[in-house]
């Protein structure tokens, strides 16, 4: 029973209670860049989830054999190898999305969420729970990306996943898109609003004043 409870906490905790973006403020740079469309936000979320989950798994499997002095190098080597695999798969099967994501898939290597979970969790926890932790943090990251991408694409372009929902004035409709929402700074403000909303309803997440 305790294992099931811990598994549930590992999977669902990062979505709201310990969200890597909203609480820890990690991985913000990619969130600003890839959320102008829901499609790219979803693919980026899936890519980071896969890399985080499998890097956690592999690092946890060999954690007792990694010398402390080179552990960061080993972690980065595993993460970089997985990022290359994900990038090649995207180029092979989703080339247009891969072009839109540009360098941001490659920059998963330096994403604080991936490195943070590898160092703080996978190095101390058995493989299966580490794998689930990677999925949970990927879900938390993806939830913020999809929420921001939903607002930016719908109100910035009047569409969702490329399908026109709000018919634009330029096409004879009624909606005037807000082009500002398609610019990266808008994502910064939207993420800030999400953090404010979450911390309003969960005041325990507010940092203590020193």
UniProtKB/Swiss-Prot annotation:
Membrane topology value: Multi-pass membrane protein
Chief localization: membrane
Cell location: Cell inner membrane
EC number(s) per entry: 7.2.1.1
Keywords: Cell inner membrane, Cell membrane, Ion transport, Membrane, NAD, Sodium, Sodium transport, Translocase, Transmembrane, Transmembrane helix, Transport, Ubiquinone
GO biological process: sodium ion transport
Catalysed reactions listed for this entry: a ubiquinone + n Na(+)(in) + NADH + H(+) = a ubiquinol + n Na(+)(out) + NAD(+)
TM spans (from-to): 14-34, 42-62, 72-92, 103-123, 131-151, 178-198
Broad enzyme group: translocase
InterPro entries per record: NqrD (IPR011292), NqrDE/RnfAE (IPR003667)
GO MF entries: oxidoreductase activity, acting on NAD(P)H, quinone or similar compound as acceptor
Entry GO CC: plasma membrane
HAMAP family, alphabetized: NqrD
Function per UniProt: NQR complex catalyzes the reduction of ubiquinone-1 to ubiquinol by two successive reactions, coupled with the transport of Na(+) ions from the cytoplasm to the periplasm. NqrA to NqrE are probably involved in the second step, the conversion of ubisemiquinone to ubiquinol.
Subunit comment: Composed of six subunits; NqrA, NqrB, NqrC, NqrD, NqrE and NqrF.
Xref: PANTHER family: ELECTRON TRANSPORT COMPLEX PROTEIN RNFE, NA(+)-TRANSLOCATING NADH-QUINONE REDUCTASE SUBUNIT D
Family the UniProt entry places it in: Belongs to the NqrDE/RnfAE family.
Protein's UniProt name: Na(+)-translocating NADH-quinone reductase subunit D
Origin species: Shewanella oneidensis (strain ATCC 700550 / JCM 31522 / CIP 106686 / LMG 19005 / NCIMB 14063 / MR-1)
Gene designation per UniProt: nqrD
């Amino acid at each position: 029973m305790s294992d099931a409870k811990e598994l549930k906490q590992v999977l669902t905790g990062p979505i709201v209670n310990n969200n890597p973006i909203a609480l820890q403020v990690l991985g913000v740079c990619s969130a600003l860049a890839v959320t102008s469309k829901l499609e790219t936000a979803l693919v980026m979320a899936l890519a980071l989830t896969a890399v985080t989950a499998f890097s956690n798994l592999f690092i946890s499997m060999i954690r007792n054999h990694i010398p402390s002095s080179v552990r960061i190098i080993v972690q980065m080597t595993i993460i970089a190898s997985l990022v290359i695999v994900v990038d090649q798969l995207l180029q092979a099967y989703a080339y247009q999305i891969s072009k839109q994501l540009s360098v941001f898939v490659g920059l998963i290597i330096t994403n604080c969420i991936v490195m943070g979970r590898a160092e703080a969790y996978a190095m101390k926890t058995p493989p299966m729970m580490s794998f689930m932790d990677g999925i949970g943090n990927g879900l938390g990251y993806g939830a913020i990306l999809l929420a921001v991408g939903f607002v930016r694409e719908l109100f910035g372009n009047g569409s969702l996943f490329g399908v026109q929902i709000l018919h634009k004035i330029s096409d004879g409709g009624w909606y005037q898109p807000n082009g500002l929402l398609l610019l990266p700074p808008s994502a910064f403000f939207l993420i800030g609003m999400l953090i404010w909303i979450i911390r309003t309803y969960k005041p325990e997440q507010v940092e203590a004043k020193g």
